[in-house]
Swiss-Prot record:
Annotated disulfide bonds: none
GO terms under cellular component: mitochondrial matrix; mitochondrion
Motif 'KMSKS' region in this chain: 649-653
Function in brief: Aminoacyl-tRNA synthetase that catalyzes the specific attachment of isoleucine to its cognate tRNA (tRNA(Ile)).
Organism: Gallus gallus
Organism taxonomic ancestry: Eukaryota, Metazoa, Chordata, Craniata, Vertebrata
Pfam families listed in its UniProt record: Anticodon_1, tRNA-synt_1
Gene3D superfamilies, alphabetized: 1.10.730.20, HUPs, Ile-tRNA synthetase CP2 domain-like
NCBIfam families, per the entry: ileS (TIGR00392)
SUPFAM superfamilies from the UniProt entry: Anticodon-binding domain of a subclass of class I aminoacyl-tRNA synthetases, Nucleotidylyl transferase, ValRS/IleRS/LeuRS editing domain
Official protein name in the record: Isoleucine--tRNA ligase, mitochondrial
Chief site of localization: mitochondrion
């Protein structure tokens, strides 16, 4: 039941305690008091006989020393060589964390730190557990932001050729990569730094085009003319993942009327031509009105024909919007008739600004009743739903806006060359007003898409682009995603919803810094030439020369005569190379094809921020499922964003931007920005709830530093008490240990198990909480406080001392390994200060926590926790006074609790028993019945303790009494316990130890 450690049960009643011998008072206590100077002299007399802790490991490192200490530790411990070492060792299992490539366009920031450190904690944990870790860092190197930044550094950039632009962009990306790489290494990130991947590497680009090739062959890639998100500021199409939304965008909304040309047949009796009649429409994008081709209604909704009190004309709008619209227009509506949306069929209107154009009334399911009038102006070139309606009804999709966001000549002289979001909008509103169609204009604040890089407003614009037909791969992707473990689970539905909304993916971009779409166009007809053979030919060239070849080589070397002939052409020179490049999400989304090894090419983990649910996670899934019908990952771990410590977005104007380099090395003014070192940054990451937004600032960093200093104090105590101890030769078997030492091993085993499980679940904040609780509650506050006497005052090689030293050695090893993935610098620093030669290879080359299952002893908690409950009662009864100045009597009724305490103290009274050590008293007496006489100055406390053994099969509640009274003994000048007969003479134990030292 309790294990072999427990003494045989003895339920006899002890003889009554000799009251006179213990409670005799005399004047001994007064005589024992000494002057401080005299006490100091006598203490110093025995100082050299006490085994005080000693270690060169600092309890706290001054901030100025922290960065250099970490760099020295990295060098001594071989941080840079660790990755290649673990790749070369024999390991049964492989663990692959595929690095989502950060964008190579700037300095490292705390978002990078959060992401890279989380990955490193994950990798180091798995490596220590015996896995062969595969982690190849990479960078996303193409795209508009890099191109624009590179060009901003060049005078006359507008005159550069595509080849020159590409060269400048590549050089810029390379510089950014070197900066970021140096920072990541400084943070202690373990990775294959010698073989990083970059999306501009020829082999990467070739593998990317191979994925494109397979998707094209399977029919997933096509060209079409339809509306896409368009960035006028960047002059290119963008995917939805490249948008960010401005919640405070101000649009110019208008209420306008479309005069009825043909009344819907079912409303002929109501709208008979006796009064002017129009449909009432609301839009936040007046500039799209010239492209209007129809007005849409919701078939199942109710609509009203109303008479306007101001003008007397008839207006049609949704019945649910009559009251609110009348209020906005500052008029009154008289409802003449109500009908269903389907009753509006076969009606048509006059275009409000273009004479002679007819806009039919058409049904559509995207019409909503929450705002506007329930009738939607439909411009197929500027809306996804509008385009679908137009396709269904064979309406034209004419785009009157050019790539820079200006009206084209086809829009008419009044609008030509005007910016649609600025003066173009104003011009259209004036045209509506001139035509008598404008009823109301007002500012409208709403969420609006912006280009994520230029930070300028987007528009939706029809253009000829290349697409991935995600509608055909979506169902398979959703099924594949259901087999993926996603942490936290709250991200599952969000990713599925984002995937469900995506019907197509625009993959073409009108820039030159990227991977070209391998397509050729007939000069005269514009007809595209692309097939399996032409793509394969381009891939061969790209693999050898890189994608620069697309711009530098003549078309004759890129397109074969055979391919032209097969397509029905006659001359290669009749064709031109396409000028579009692939979306950078397609670049990074095919990284699995280049980086992941083995036949399966599947990573164990992708770990990125929540913005990647619609970005890299999704693009990787779509490309992998389209070509292989499986996800490229087994687990997704999704973390939040970094914010200022008050929860606000970081901004230079606010002054709350945290620079990781300043965190580590300090700023110009160390009083304002002190150096913390990389481990503080790593602790901040680990202790945060990374599945929500992660806060950082001076208060957070100071708290992290203080937490590490507390941990250092705990480590220093253990290191300091290891002097002269060699675990290989001096360890005591658990069966021969003090029960409290066995109890600590039991707690160590439990701690190791819980920490391991927390790491497995990527719950690193739980690891930190477990670590702090174990070090503070179990070690510092409990175990260290009761074993100091054994450590300092017993003979150096006494088994009792060796017993707790054995536990300290095991605890140090378990604790250091448990936080090593989080604080690798501190972990290696501790191992470098071990006073014995143990694991000279360091922490990371010697495995994970080795907590023996033999340490687990169910039931042992009851003995120690029962004793601790009584100690708490005892300490509470003396109100913060020194427990060493008291003797304690514990009275327990016969039963399990009494048996457990007997295992800790076989004698009736003892100053050296295990129970007395826990009580921290001068002497402990254990009785099974209350003494007949109790001194008046005794403190008596009663309590109960519930014993729960064998998983609850054995339960017994026992009552106890704790009687505390001042001791009559003097303070020993050596051990400072009240166990001596005279304040000038050491206690019997200390005399024996001193005598032993003299004999040696």
């Amino acid at each position: 039941m309790l294990g072999a450690w427990r003494a045989a049960p003895r339920l006899r009643l002890r003889a009554r305690f000799g009251v006179a011998s213990v409670w005799a008072r005399s004047a001994a206590s007064e005589a024992n008091s000494r002057r401080p100077a005299e006490e100091s002299r006598q203490d110093s007399q025995y100082r050299d006989t006490v085994l005080l802790p000693h270690s060169r490991f600092a309890a706290q490192l001054p901030g100025r020393l922290q960065p250099d200490t970490e760099l020295e530790t990295q060098q001594k411990s071989g941080f840079l060589e660790l990755y290649s070492w673990q790749r070369q060792r024999k390991a049964k299992q492989e663990f692959c964390l595929h690095d989502g490539p950060p964008y190579a366009n700037g300095d490292p920031h705390v978002g990078h730190a959060l992401n890279k450190i989380l990955k490193d904690i994950t990798n180091r944990f798995h490596m220590m557990r015996g896995y062969k870790v595969h982690y190849v860092p990479g960078w996303d190197c193409h795209g508009l932001p890099i191109e624009l930044k590179a060009l901003s550094e060049v005078k006359g950039a507008e005159n550069l050729s595509p080849v020159e632009i590409r060269q400048k962009a590549k050089e810029f990306a390379e510089r950014a990569i070197e900066k970021q790489k140096a920072a990541f290494i400084r943070w202690g990130i373990m990775a294959d730094w010698a073989n990083c991947y970059r999306t501009f590497d020829p082999k990467y680009e070739a593998n990317q085009l191979r994925v494109f090739h397979k998707m094209y062959d399977k029919g997933f890639i096509y060209q079409d003319y339809k509306p896409v998100f368009w960035s006028p500021s960047a002059k290119t199409a963008l995917a939805e993942a490249e948008l960010e939304y401005n919640e405070q965008h101000v649009s110019r909304s208008v209420y306008m009327k479309f005069p009825l040309l043909k009344s819907p047949p079912k409303l002929a009796s109501v709208i008979d031509g006796s009064s002017p009649a129009s449909v009432l429409v609301w839009t936040t994008q007046p500039w799209t009105v010239p492209a209007n081709q129809a007005v849409c209604y919701m078939p199942d909704a109710e609509y009203s024909v109303v008479k306007c009190a101001t003008t007397g004309e008839h207006l049609i709008l949704a019945a649910d919007r009559v009251e609110s619209t009348a209020a906005v227009l500052d008029t009154q509506f008289e409802v003449i008739s109500t009908c269903k949306g389907v009753d509006l069929a076969d009606g048509s209107c006059a275009h409000p600004t273009i004479a002679g154009r007819v806009s039919p009334l058409l049904p559509a399911n995207h019409v909503t009743m929450t705002k506007g009038t329930g009738l939607v102006h439909t411009a197929p070139a500027h809306g996804m739903e509008d385009y679908n309606v137009a396709s269904h009804h064979q309406l034209p999709t004419e785009c009157l806006v050019d790539e820079s966001g200006h009206f084209t000549e086809a829009a008419g002289p009044e609008l030509k060359n005007k910016n649609v979001l600025e003066e173009g909008n104003e011009a259209v509103i004036k045209m509506l007003q001139a035509a008598g169609s404008l009823l109301k204009e007002e500012k409208y604040v709403h969420s609006y898409p912006y280009d994520w890089r230029t930070k300028k407003p987007m528009i939706i614009r029809a253009s000829k682009q290349w697409f991935v037909n995600t509608a055909n791969v979506k169902a398979t992707a959703q099924e594949a995603l259901k087999k993926v473990k996603i942490i936290p689970t709250s991200a599952v539905n969000r990713m599925l919803e984002m995937l469900d909304r995506r019907t197509f993916w625009c993959i073409s971009r009108q820039r030159c810094w990227g991977v070209p779409i391998p397509v050729f166009y007939q000069k005269d007809t514009g007809e595209s030439l692309i097939n399996s053979e032409t793509i394969a030919d381009v891939i061969k060239i790209v693999e050898q020369q890189g994608t620069d070849a697309w711009w530098t080589l003549p078309i004759e070397q890129l397109l074969s005569k055979e391919a032209v002939a097969k397509a029905g052409g006659h001359n290669v020179l009749d064709y031109v190379k396409g000028q579009d490049v692939l979306d950078i999400w397609f670049d990074s989304g095919t990284s699995w094809a280049h980086v992941l090894e083995g036949a399966e090419q599947r990573a164990d983990v992708y770990l990125e921020g929540k913005d990647q649910l619609g970005g890299w996670f999704q693009s990787s899934l779509l490309t992998s499922v389209a070509t292989r019908k499986k996800a490229p990952y087994k687990t997704l771990v999704v973390h939040g964003f970094t914010l200022g410590e008050k929860g606000e977005k970081m901004s230079k104007s606010i002054g709350n931007v945290v620079d990781p380099d300043v965190v580590i090395n300090g700023g110009d003014d160390h009083t304002k920005d002190p150096p913390y070192g990389a481990d503080v940054l790593r602790w901040w990451v680990a202790e945060s709830n990374v599945f929500t937004e992660v806060l950082i600032g001076p208060v957070v960093l100071n708290a992290a530093r203080d937490d590490i200093n507390k941990l250092r104090n705990t480590l220093r105590f253990m290191l300091g008490n290891m002097a002269g101890f060699n675990p290989e030769t001096d360890s005591i078997p658990p069966s021969e240990m003090y029960i409290v030492d066995q109890y600590m091993l039991h707690l160590l085993q439990d701690y190791g198990s819980k920490v391991t499980e927390a790491y497995k679940e990527y719950d690193y904040s739980k690891v930190v909480r477990l670590l702090q609780a174990f070090c503070s509650r179990n070690l510092s506050n409990f175990y260290f406080s009761i074993i100091k006497d054994r450590l300092y005052c017993e003979e150096e090689k006494d088994p009792k001392r060796r017993s707790c030293q054995t536990v300290l050695a095991e605890a140090l090893d378990v604790v250091v390994r448990s936080f090593a993935p989080i604080l690798p610098h501190l972990a290696e620093e501790v191992f470098q200060h071990l006073p014995y030669k143990k694991d000279s290879e360091g922490v990371f080359r010697t495995g994970w926590i080795n907590a023996s299952s033999g340490w687990k002893k169910p039931g042992i908690e009851e003995a120690i926790e029962g004793a601790c409950a009584m100690r708490d009662s005892f300490l509470g009864s003396i109100s913060g006074k020194n427990a060493l100045e008291y003797e304690v009597i514990i009275v327990i009724e016969p039963g399990l609790l009494f048996e457990l305490m007997e295992a800790l103290q076989a004698e009736e009274s003892s100053r050296v028993s295990q129970l007395n050590e826990i009580m921290m008293a001068s002497q402990t007496t254990l009785l099974s019945e209350i003494p007949k006489e109790t001194p008046a100055d005794a403190n008596i406390v009663k309590g109960n303790f519930l014993i729960n053994l064998e998983g609850g099969d054995i339960r017994e509640e026992s009552s106890y009494q704790v009687i505390a009274l001042p001791t009559t003994k003097a303070k020993c000048p050596r051990c400072r316990r009240y166990t001596s007969d005279s304040s000038s003479t050491p206690c019997p134990r200390c005399l024996k130890v001193i005598a032993g030292k003299g004999s040696t």
